[in-house]
Every structure is written in C-alpha cells, then in structure tokens.
C-alpha cells in the first residue's frame, strides 16, 4: 500500500532536488513517472502483479525517477532493490552521480553497492601462489614468467594484503593483461567459501557486502546468471526484491544468449583427454575409499565421450554447409543424431557429477586439516576449469537431446565448421523464445518490477516487447504501461527530411548513388553524423568521398579506424574550433552516443536499419513464424527496424535546447505500406517529405 509515509518521503526528495540543482526544471512527465512507479510497486493497481513497463523519452530523467520511487517503497517494506543495466556507462552514472545525489535529497537512509561477476575479482590464494609467497609459483605458468610479470604480481599481493586494493580488476590503477589475470582470477570451485583459506578472498568479501546493502546495481547478465542458479545465490532472492531493469530493450537478447550453449567436438575431446590423464593425480588427494566410485565413473564417462565426439566429426559433410553453417530445419535432428545426443548427454552429465564430487572430497580433507591447502589449491583450480567445461558440455547435449516440442517455439540447433581447427565442428543450441523462462524465474516471483528504456515500443506498441520478455500485456493481467514523450519541443527544434530519391536501398546502384548525393546533405562548419546499416557500404562511401572531403576542408572520421574515445575527442576539438566534422558509423553509433548541443546538429541515416536474418537463431525464428502462418518480415523485421530507427534519430536532440536536422535517405518510408507506421513511431519532428 502507498502509505502517507512513503508519499511524504517522495515529495520531500523532489522538493530537495529542486533546491540541490541550480538549473532544475520541474517536469510533469518525471513527476508522473515517479507516481506511477510508486503506485504500481505498492500494489495500487494489482495486488500480486506489480509490474510497470515504461518508455520514457530522452530528457525525462528516468534514473532519478525510479530511484525516487522504488527506494522509499523498498526501505519502508524492508525489501531490496536490484537495478540492472545493459552498459557499464549507465552503471557508472548510477554509482558515481545519481545514487549519491539521491542520498543527499532523501530522508530515507539506504546503502548501495555495485555487484560484479566473480571473474572481475582475483583469488587471494592464487595471487599468493603466483607471486611466490607460498612456493609453487612456477607451476602456475606455462612458460617461464617475465620479471615484470612477477613484479606486478608481487605488487598486487602487497596491495591486497595491506588493504590498499580490494582485488577488483577494475579498481587496479592500470589495465591487467588477460594472460596474468587468468592465473589469479576467482573461480567458483577452488575459490570456495567452505575452504578456510578463501573466506577472506575478495569475491567472498564482496558477496557478503551485497547482503548488507539495500540497493544493488548489477547488469542484465548477472541477473540472468543468478536466475539460472535458482535466484538468491548471487543476488537477493526474487521474493524479497524489487527489480528495476533500465535499458530494458536489451533484456530479451541477453536472456536468450544466456540460455544458449555451444561446444566444439575435437576441442572437447582434447581437453577430455587431458582430464583422463589427470584423474589418478586428482583422486590421490581425496580419501581413497570414498573417491573410488567417482574415479571409476569419471574414467568410464570420459573414455566413452572421447571416441564418441571424435567419431561425430566424421559424420558431418562440410559440403552440405552454407557459409560454414548447417542449421537443422525446425530444430529437428535426424534419428541417429538424436540417439547419439542422448548418449552424450548421459556421459557428460555423469562426468560432470563425478568431477564435482572429487573436488568436494578434496575440499573436505582441506577443511578437516588432513591435506595442506597449498597442495590442494592447484588441483582444485584445475578441477574448477574442468567442471566449468563439463557443465557447458552437459548443457549442450541436454539441449540437443531435448525432444521436439509439440507446443511453443522449437530450439534452434546448428553446426558450424571450426574457424581455426580443420575437421572440427561447433555444436550450438539456442531457444527462440525466452519469455516463459523470465516469467518463471523473475516476474512470477519478485515483489515488483519496473522496466524502463527510451525505446521500448515498436510501431507505437508494447506488444512485441512483452512477447519477447514474457510479460502478460492483457488489461486484466494488471501490468501497467506508460509511454512518456520527451520534453523536447521537436516541432520547433528539429526537422525530419525525407528527400526525393532516384533509387531505393534495395537497388544495386544505391551505393554509387549514395556517394553522389551524400555531400549535398552534409553541412559546412557543423557537426555531422552519418549512420550506415553495413560496414561494407560505410567503407565504400568513405573511400570514394575522402578526397572530396579533403578538398572541402571537411574532417572525416570512420568508425573502427580509431577507438570510439579517440574519435569523439577529435570530433569535439574540431567542433570547438568551428571546423566541419563528419562522423561515419554503423549500429553501435546509433545507440548510446551522446553528442549534445553543437556536437551534433546534422544527422543523416542512409537507410532503414532492417536486420537480415543471417544468424541461425534469426533464421529459425522466421521459419517458426512462417510455419504458424505468420509473416516474419512484419512480425520481427519491421518492429526491430522501428526500434533501431527510433534509437538512431534519438542521437540528434540530447538536451532541451539542442536543435538540428535528421535526413533519412530511404524512400521506402514513403513508397512501402509499412513506411507510414515507421514514420509515425518517430518523435514528432517537423516533417518535410519531398515528392
């Protein structure tokens, strides 16, 4: 229930915000968003389904809105808040700017912490060994270590021991080489809380800190990893949590990637052979009587897996592959492969269970003081590596062996020729739809959830997004939907131009035509951004126009030629000195690129960003929709393009006083039946359509 206490707390923080910020402009949309989040989370619309899906345009102040509403509700009810983002940039903004600001303006005391995956932390015991503190140093290196590597490890060890560093890779003053990090990274098997020597490890300390905090900032991948473990393992349990998913439009893809699995055949056989040779070494560290059964089971499983995987590589004919890929239509496997998958599932599962049991028995002896930690550590780290690989292998064959579903979307299953190993194949499996899983793991269990993004709707509807993430969009379900327009005055600040064009992007002459007409739509002494749908076309146009741009005194920078940071730094310098700056970019430049004011006044989009279903998952999804009598182009491709186009045009106005022009060089917006729907889903720019 939305108590007067919570309402008062929210009102106070809003009033204090006005006092804190000199240039604060009260926004009705922000007020409304705060109120709707609070009402939804307090069960005012629906007692059990407390979910709000909100599209909030640029400039509304999304992050402060959900902090102002969700934190008072959670603290009042003694619950946790997990804020999940898709990018590091937004996490940094929340931790360094928004949360400290909210802490200053609220009357509620709360604590917050950034949660990271285990792989961001070092293991104190591994670091001690690698730096030579407890002997066994050289055994950790495959080749003789360089002097500077040893010196770095020693410095890191001292900093950790003296409390000057917390073991977080991102907190070390300089980047740490992957080669060094792999030696000391925490893994869930050797860096285990049940082992006395690891209770003070950086990861264990960070995890225990999570429990003490009210607000936890995570990323979508970490939330999915916790959900896969049953929830409440890495993060607080869903039943005690209010989730806020910012940049929520990324959630469907992150969730799908998380539920996918792949493994190479020869590659797996090779590391299984190494495991086979080490079984006796590992077993000798455990209690002989208790380990015997698991050692025998492991030997039996591994000795069945190696020939089966090797034999499988001879069953596939690369001549039947298209561009190195063979996809099983409708996810259906031939009977012989179905049977083989069931066997491989059995053996890999048995091997995984046996290795995990041997690791447990070794850890038990360390705990009981029967085995020195320094002898067990290297073995447990190595076993951790094998357990991780076996878990993945077991997951691949579990999904491959799963019977074809009578209802719902099938699994996408495919093979790829290995890019680096001749005669090897990668076996991959992915679900097509992940919504039901998100519902089971999160929506049906959590206290409440808020999903926000600047681009949530496709073609002015939330339907596509709801289907992707498994949220019931029917009015009677109780789910709340909100689409808040940006506070910008689009009509007076920006123009959308769709010029008359000789060719559409599908015409073979389009690239040549683009080279001919593009300079006409660029502005002298201004900041220009041109967005392409393909790297190939971008590079062709850049190459053809570079000499003309030099003649005109225009500075051209192309995505990929330098780091994004370097490109933007140079761009800023050019704009500050009143030079013409032209940026060429593709997909990743159409999202998350923040160029306010004079840093971007002219945006050109060369074509509607239609995705081509090239990946096996996209192809399988299209096939499934066709089988159901649907139209994949209208059901997947157009809604996806709509979201991407909204993101692209969103680069132009970043702050309330910004202005400029967007030109879209794709006549299909006018000539095709879906064109009007795409235009109508864009912000309400002043439109100029040439005929």
Regions found by a protein language model. Give the residues of each.
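Conserved RecA-like P-loop NTPase helicase motor core
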Residues: 487, 499-509, 561-670
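Signature of the SF2 helicase/ATPase Hel1-core->accessory helical subdomain module
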Residues: 66, 72, 89-92, 97-100, ...
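Conserved interdomain hinge at the start of the Helicase C-terminal
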Residues: 440, 499-533
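Conserved pre-motif I regulatory segment
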Residues: 2-54
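Walker A/P-loop
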Residues: 46-68
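A substrate-engagement module of RecA-like helicase motors
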Residues: 2-18, 47, 58, 78-81, ...
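A contiguous, basic/glycine-rich beta-loop/short-helix subdomain that forms a polymer-engagement track
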Residues: 182-214, 224-234, 361-499, 564-575, ...
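Conserved helicase motor "Helicase C" RecA-like lobe of SF1/SF2 P-loop NTPases
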Residues: 533-560
């Amino acid at each position: 229930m939305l108590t007067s206490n919570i309402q008062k707390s929210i009102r106070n923080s809003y009033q204090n915000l006005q006092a804190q910020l000199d240039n604060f402009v009260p926004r009705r949309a922000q007020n409304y968003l705060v109120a709707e989040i609070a009402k939804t989370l307090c069960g005012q619309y629906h007692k059990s389904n407390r979910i709000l899906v909100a599209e909030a345009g640029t400039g509304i102040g999304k992050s402060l809105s959900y902090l102002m509403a969700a934190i008072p509700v959670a603290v009042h009810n003694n619950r946790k808040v997990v804020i999940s983002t898709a990018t590091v940039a937004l996490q940094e903004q929340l931790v360094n700017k928004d949360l400290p600001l909210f802490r200053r303006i609220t009357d509620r005391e709360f604590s917050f912490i950034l949660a990271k995956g285990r792989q961001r932390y070092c293991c104190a015991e591994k670091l001690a060994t690698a730096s030579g503190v407890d002997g066994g140093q050289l055994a950790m290196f495959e080749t003789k270590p360089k002097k500077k590597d040893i010196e770095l490890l020693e410095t890191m060890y001292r900093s950790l021991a003296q409390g000057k560093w917390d073991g977080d890779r991102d907190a070390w003053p300089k980047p740490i080489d992957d080669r060094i990090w792999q030696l000391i990274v925490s893994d869930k098997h050797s860096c285990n809380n049940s082992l006395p020597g690891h209770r003070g490890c950086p990861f264990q300390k960070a995890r225990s800190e999570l429990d003490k905090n009210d607000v936890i900032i995570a990323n979508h991948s970490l939330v999915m990893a916790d959900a896969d473990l049953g929830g409440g393992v890495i993060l607080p349990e869903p039943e005690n949590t209010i989730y806020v998913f910012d940049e929520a439009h990324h959630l469907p893809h992150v969730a799908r990637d998380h539920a996918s699995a792949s493994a190479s055949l020869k590659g797996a056989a090779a590391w299984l052979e190494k495991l086979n040779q080490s079984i006796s070494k590992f077993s000798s560290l455990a209690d002989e009587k208790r380990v015997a059964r698991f050692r025998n089971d492991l030997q039996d499983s591994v000795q069945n897996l190696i020939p089966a995987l090797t034999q499988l590589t001879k069953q596939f004919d690369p001549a039947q592959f298209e561009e190195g890929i063979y996809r099983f239509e409708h996810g259906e496997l031939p009977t012989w492969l179905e049977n083989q998958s069931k066997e491989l599932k059995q053996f890999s599962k048995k091997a995984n269970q046996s290795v995990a049991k041997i690791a447990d028995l070794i850890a038990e002896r360390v705990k009981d003081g029967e085995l020195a930690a320094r002898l067990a550590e290297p073995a447990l780290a190595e076993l951790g590596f094998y357990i991780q690989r076996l878990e993945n292998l077991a997951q691949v064959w579990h999904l491959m062996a799963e019977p074809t579903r009578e209802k719902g979307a099938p699994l996408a299953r495919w093979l790829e020729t290995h890019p680096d190993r001749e005669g090897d194949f990668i076996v991959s499996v992915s679900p097509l739809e992940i919504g039901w899983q998100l519902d089971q793991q999160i929506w049906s269990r959590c206290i409440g959830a808020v999903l926000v993004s600047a681009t949530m709707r496709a073609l002015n509807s939330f339907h596509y997004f709801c289907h992707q993430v498994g949220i019931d969009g029917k009015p009677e379900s109780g789910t709340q939907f909100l689409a808040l327009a940006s506070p910008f005055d689009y009509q007076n600040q920006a123009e959308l131009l769709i010029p008359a064009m000789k060719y559409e992007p599908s015409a073979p002459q389009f690239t040549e035509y683009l080279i001919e007409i593009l300079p006409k739509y660029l502005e002298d002494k201004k900041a220009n951004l041109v967005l392409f749908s393909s790297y190939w076309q971008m590079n062709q146009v850049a190459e053809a126009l570079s000499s003309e741009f030099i003649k005109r005194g225009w500075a051209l920078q192309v995505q990929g030629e330098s780091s994004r940071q370097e490109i933007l730094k140079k761009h800023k310098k050019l704009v500050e000195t009143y030079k013409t700056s032209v940026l060429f970019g593709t997909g990743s430049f159409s999202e998350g690129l923040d160029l306010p004011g004079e840093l971007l006044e002219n945006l050109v989009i060369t074509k509607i960003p239609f995705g081509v279903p090239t990946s096996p998952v996209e192809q399988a999804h299209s096939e499934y929709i066709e089988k159901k009598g649907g139209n994949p182009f209208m059901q997947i491709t157009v809604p996806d393009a709509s979201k991407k186009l909204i993101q692209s045009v969103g680069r132009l106005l970043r702050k309330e006083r910004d202005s400029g022009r967007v030109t879209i060089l794709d006549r299909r917006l006018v000539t095709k039946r879906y064109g009007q729907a795409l235009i109508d889903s864009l912000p309400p720019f002043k439109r100029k359509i040439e005929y």
